[in-house]
């Protein structure tokens, strides 16, 4: 039996996450759930009866920060070390499958070993990665004036880099923009 690993990153929408876990609860699936360290820990173990559920509450995740990538690597590495899966699906805790588990497994069996990674045609991230953006971890702080000061500092920093024609990365390959959610072998 080919098993799938669902790697879920969650931080809120607990009712939707609960529904997601119920919909993924299938003996052909293992579920790796990371709940953001800033969020209250909720034990969803009682909601899953057929799949193996592994819950982690370890990393403080910030939007636009390296911590997002750290959680992704953590989930991929943990799942890879625990089992041999035909597919690894990285999804958010706010996603819900549109098909049944039988239909999902049949689709991926028919398309194995195709990698499903999205990107946007004609859009690159060159303008975003060529500059250094300061204080990404503090993108949203609670102090209104602090937010304005940080925003001005970031804007000024990018302005100076443009003025000096500074290029942080000199890449020959073109990097594309796309979603972080994937289904890979």
Regions found by a protein language model. Name each.
Residues 1-185:
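ER/Golgi luminal nucleotide-sugar-dependent glycosyltransferases, focusing on the catalytic module
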